[in-house]
Amino acid sequence: MKKLTSMLLALALVLSLAACGGAASSSVASSAASSEAVPEAASEAASSEEAKELSTTDALRIAGLKGPTTMGLVNLLSMEKDGTASLDYDLQLYGAADEIVPKLIKGELDMAAIPANLAATLYQKTNGGIQVMAVNTLGVLYVVEKGNTVHSFADLRGRTILSTGKGTTPEYVLRYLLKKNGLDPDKDVKIEYYSEASEVTAQMAAARKDAIAVLPQPYVTAAQMKDSGLRVVLDLTKEWNRVCDTQLITGVTVVRTEYAKQNPDVIAAFLTDYQKSVKAANEDIDGTAALCEEVGVVAKAAIAKKALPKCNIVYRNGQEMKKDISAYLQVLYDASPAAVGGKLPDDNFYYTEPSVLRKVMAAIRNSAK
């Protein structure tokens, strides 16, 4: 036990350096594994058996939005219930990102799953007060129509488009793609924004024929299950890939920088649990769908079950995360600097572990045998 405790302290030291990011982290992180950066040994080091060794035993307060970015988190609760989670979790759901932001800034939350561009903006506004730990969702946006008049971007000219996500991913992705397809988003179309995707689906349900909207999964699936006349006309992920060579990223998971510095061992334990939760979301569709309904992420399990395979739920951390997010933010910045808070975030924005972490993890694993 003493040997294991010493190694946990060494792990905490390594992670505290990583949490600071910067030149020290960047110089040693280039060879770190991406999705494998938190190996199985971390689970052993931060298991419930060793919970007393963690820097805090308080429940980890993490917020998410109703929809795809939180679908990868729900299995944390089942893991906690069956005793396989490394931590206790307080998962809080909100309808809009602007409900999460003040709580995160005030320290009422430890982590949150939010849009990628919002994370960059918050990093600027808080002077480095948050860091991004993982990509959680890739492209999930679609243009849908209640009719049969839209077959390409050109058909959107002169039309009204209902959308959610003003100031976040839906707005900037839509505007970017409109411009790339020869349309001025301020002149050639009218975009009406709503706070939540559920409001857009309600508007579409009540709308006349030929209404158009931008919706994410699982709301596309939910709307189509209620209205068979609603059809997908444009997959915005495919459209993005057609004109851009970067990965379209919808959501990321962030942590307060202060929390990460104080509790690096908890971060390691969380990332291990999180990777398992995402794996379960992609493999145990029935179980995850039931949890989505139980928690309130999606209204009905049947909707979640049908939508989950289309939600592009992922776990990407380390250097792969940094590469994908930085490239995506560069595209947004080039189109509109305001989209990422006026300037691109520096290296401290990315919570990445130095490659030496793997050696510490290996030592912990060997000592636990």
Give the ranges of each region predicted by the language model.
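Positively charged n-region of N-terminal signal peptides that target proteins for export
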Residues: 1-11
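Bacterial Sec-type N-terminal signal peptides, specifically the leucine/valine-rich hydrophobic h-region
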Residues: 14-17
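Bacterial lipoprotein signal-peptidase II cleavage site
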Residues: 19-32
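Short, glycine-/small- and polar/acidic-enriched structural segments
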Residues: 38, 44, 49-193, 214-217, ...
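A bilobed periplasmic-binding-protein/Venus flytrap-type ligand-binding module shared by bacterial periplasmic
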Residues: 75-77, 141-152, 247-265, 314-317
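Pocket-lining segment of extracytoplasmic ligand-binding domains
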Residues: 117-118, 126, 199-293
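Secondary-structure end/capping motifs
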Residues: 260-339
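Conserved C-terminal helix/tail region of periplasmic/extracytoplasmic solute-binding proteins
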Residues: 326, 330-369
